[in-house]
């Protein structure tokens, strides 16, 4: 668990982190927040129960560098689904930013955040 990016993660993930800190300057914003089950949120705002996930191309396409084989790719997809399910059960809003629809400003990101509903479980 870290409060800053320290050059870990994709460049767009670090950009999103900087946007979230600008959107919520008075709130704690955590980078690569470790969940009890070993999964991580890319960016987490605990006070609001909001998680921002940057989904690089490997989240929607098989890429050998990331997955090694198709089983690895399928495991990655299942992991994303499991993270969403766990988040729903705990009332955490998951905002996914896909690599091919990256936002370009804090204002754009805020619009996306506000367009996603909290889970109703």
Language model features by range: what are they?
Residues 1-121:
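Nucleic-acid endo/exonuclease domains
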